[in-house]
Amino acid sequence: MPYKRITLTHFLLQEQRRLGGSGSFTALMTDIIFACKMISHEVNRGALAGNLGVAGSENVQGEEQKKLDVLANDIFLHMNALGGSYAGMASEELEDVHAVHGAADGKYLLLFDPLDGSSNIDVNISVGSIFSILKLPEGANAGSKDAFLQPGVKQVAAGYALYGSSTMLVLTTGNGVNGFTLDNNVGMFLLTHPNMTIPADTKEFAINASRERFWEPPVKRYIDECRQGKEGPRGKDFNMRWVASMVAEVHRILCRGGVFLYPADTENMKKGGKLRLMYEANPMAFIVEQAGGAATTGRGRMMEVPPTGLHQRVPVILGSKEEVERIGAYHAEYDAKK
């Protein structure tokens, strides 16, 4: 019964008491919760509200924006500026930082991908929002990108909202991972997935196989071994998954194990990779590590990568710890022979 479940707000208050906090973190999370509820509503309305299709514009990445990309970005900016907890924000959709006017006392910075996987939205496949929270460094200017360029290990919290058959918000504050499901009847996120842990054993991998011709040898080696199944060196059959929505991929891995790869390849290597360090890789790495998994570029721990720009791209390999470590070892062996 819903009334017997812990609400996300109550959960945050419990965390606040445990840590002896002032309440400012609970307040800023409340803003994110409202933003995710509003985006969920707009995603669910879809074609009924004229929300599908392209917006006729491009984002800073040079990617065509969907109508819901623009709407979700506006919702995140507006809702999270109201509370005054954030000194500044940065979005995957914006070229520069977004200073929050009238938030002189703001102690935190918010980075977000307002609508991950939006290429799927017109065909009704799950999409999501990803967010990362950092502390504003002492004496830093929240209007400068330098304040945001902190490695992933500096994150205070990270999470994502998944807009699928139900809407979920998955969150870590550095004390494990918990999942909350939106009950539309009462308008609240309720704790449904406490202490989420990635299973150690896995028989699934997620990769865009259409890019195989661009892969580096260590990635080819790993995928080839998985494909060989019981007859190969792994001694078991694997299944391949690919949704083209990072939130959906990571959520599946949190629930039943697996590994997600968007590796460096010969086509994207000059850009550093495909996915964005600050908006996608770091928050997901924090969540995955807190759930007992691992996240790497293939050549180092994701959350230790020094950021050089707001829109820096990196290779991403994350999921079940043993699989991620195996892929990292294959990269090390390959590099040692070059």
From Swiss-Prot:
Source superkingdom: Bacteria
GO cellular component term, pick one: cytosol
Record-listed E.C. numbers: 3.1.3.11
Binding-site residues for Mg(2+) 2, renumbered to this chain: D113, D116, E280
Annotated pathway: Carbohydrate biosynthesis; gluconeogenesis
Pfam family, one: FBPase
Cofactor(s) for this UniProt protein: Mg(2+)
Localization per record: Cytoplasm
Gene3D superfamilies listed in its UniProt record: 3.40.190.80, Fructose-1,6-Bisphosphatase, subunit A, domain 1
Binding positions (substrate): D116, G117, S118, S119, N208, K274
Catalytic activity, reaction form: beta-D-fructose 1,6-bisphosphate + H2O = beta-D-fructose 6-phosphate + phosphate
Any GO BP annotation: fructose metabolic process
InterPro entries membership: FBPase_C_dom, FBPase_class-1, FBPase_N, FBPtase
Binding site for Mg(2+) 1: E92, D113, L115
Main localization, broad class: cytoplasm
Keywords: Carbohydrate metabolism, Cytoplasm, Hydrolase, Magnesium, Metal-binding
Record note on cofactor: Binds 2 magnesium ions per subunit.
GO molecular function, one term: magnesium ion binding
Family: Belongs to the FBPase class 1 family.
Assembly: Homotetramer.
UniProt name for this protein: Fructose-1,6-bisphosphatase class 1
Native species: Paramagnetospirillum magneticum (strain ATCC 700264 / AMB-1) (Magnetospirillum magneticum)
